[in-house]
Structures are given as C-alpha cells and as structure tokens.
From Swiss-Prot:
Belongs to the MinC family. Gene3D superfamilies: 2.160.20.70, 3.30.160.540. GO terms for biological process: cell morphogenesis; division septum assembly; regulation of cell division; regulation of cell septum assembly. Pfam families: MinC_C, MinC_N. Interacts with MinD and FtsZ. This is Probable septum site-determining protein MinC. Cell division inhibitor that blocks the formation of polar Z ring septums. Rapidly oscillates between the poles of the cell to destabilize FtsZ filaments that have formed before they mature into polar Z rings. Prevents FtsZ polymerization. The keyword Cell division applies. Keywords: Cell cycle, Cell division, Septation.
Length: 217
C-alpha cells in the first residue's frame, strides 16, 4: 500500500506537513500546491512545520515549500520542537474521539480526517475538524470549532458544539441532512435548498445563513 505523499496533522503547535521522503521533490511541491489550492484559504493564519522523516531535505527545497505555504497565508513555526517526536502522520480511529481541555484556536487543535465518512460513523472533537473526503448520509461530525469538508457534505454536521457562535461550516458541496451551529439547527427540506458550489454556513443572529466561499486575501 503506497504512502501518502503529503499528510497533514493538527497539533497544539499548529499544522505539521509530513512528507514522504521516497518521493521526488517536484512531486511533493506540486502536491502541496494542489492541497493549498483545494483548501481555498481555510488554513490562513495557521502556524505550520514541515517534517521530512529521517531524511535531511536541502535548505533550498524546504524554503521553497515554506514559501508556498506563506503565499496561502500560513505562518512558519521556526521552533524545531514544533514537530513532536512522537507525532504520527495518520490518525488512528480512536483518536477521532479524543478529548482535549484546550480552547479551540485558529491553527491549533485541528483534527484531520483523511477519508470519507460512511453511514454510522461519527467524528467528535473539541477543536476544528477537517474531512478530506465526503461525509455521506448517516455519518456525523461534531466539532467545537469549524468544520471543513473537502468534498460533498450530506451527513449530520454540528459546529461550535460548545456554544462557539463564530463557528462555520465549509464544504465543496454542502447538502447536509441536518446542520447545527452553536445549537441553532437547520434541516433543509430538499438537497437543492442550498446553492451549489463551495459554500460557507454561519450564524447571523439566530439564523443559519449560507454564502459563497470567498478565499481570504
């Protein structure tokens, strides 16, 4: 089974980009550009570090990757300790239900779920949740912060579960069975009730509204 070229893990110190040391640099660079473009500014303001396993990366190449992330608004974390020695590039299923006492902050405590969620599967996390895949009907995501679905979102989504009124839900295709933000609930009568394309759901007063996603500049 082939290893993912770039995997992303959220830690207390921000995001860590784990690179496959067996792949060519141009492949890694192009994959990073694709991931940044797909995120559409969602990670802007997040701190990040790059881990190349046990293999040393030439400074010029690493700087090139860092500059790509900078262009998309990420902030390099220059502290080498920012990459935990025991960090892993793939979250275990049990980790998706892990609890944390830390208050969710932009760029911190982001759980990356690098797979689609099927009916009956539930992800619960006190910080932000990023699903790199689809959320199918019958699947559920519960987040204390924002929810980003880099795919089609047709399940049950609960953002700002602890009462965070600023929480948002972003999906490339947003057609949830039920969506709630800080306890405010929305259940569309028809899948086409929400406009197509990448949409952002947020609270406006006591109502959930939907807006076309605009990348931060």
């Amino acid at each position: 089974m082939s290893r993912e070229m770039i995997s992303i893990k959220g830690t207390r110190n921000g995001l860590v980009f784990f690179l496959d040391p067996t792949r060519e640099f141009e492949e890694i660079k192009n994959t990073l550009l694709s991931k940044m473009e797909s995120a559409r500014g969602f990670f802007k303001g997040a701190k990040f570090s790059i881990s190349h396993g046990q293999k040393d990366m030439p400074v010029e190449q690493k700087n090139e990757l860092v500059n790509i992330c900078r262009r998309y608004g990420l902030i390099p974390n220059n502290d080498d300790a920012a990459v935990p020695a025991n960090a892993v590039s793939k979250a275990s299923p049990r980790a998706t239900r892990a609890a944390s006492n830390s208050k969710p902050t932009i760029g911190e405590n982001a759980l990356m779920v690098r797979r689609s969620l099927r009916s009956g599967q539930c992800i619960s996390y006190p910080g932000h949740v990023v699903v790199i895949g689809d959320v199918h009907p019958g699947a559920e995501v519960i987040s204390g912060g924002n929810v980003l679905v880099m795919g089609s979102c047709r399940g049950l989504i609960h953002a700002g579960a602890g009462g965070n009124l600023m929480a948002k839900v972003v999906a490339l295709r947003l057609a949830p069975t039920v969506l709630s933000i800080a306890g405010q609930r929305y259940a569309p009568e028809h899948p086409s009730a929400i406009p197509p394309g990448c949409q952002v759901a947020r609270l406006s007063g006591q109502e959930i509204i939907f807006e076309k996603f605009q990348a931060a500049r």
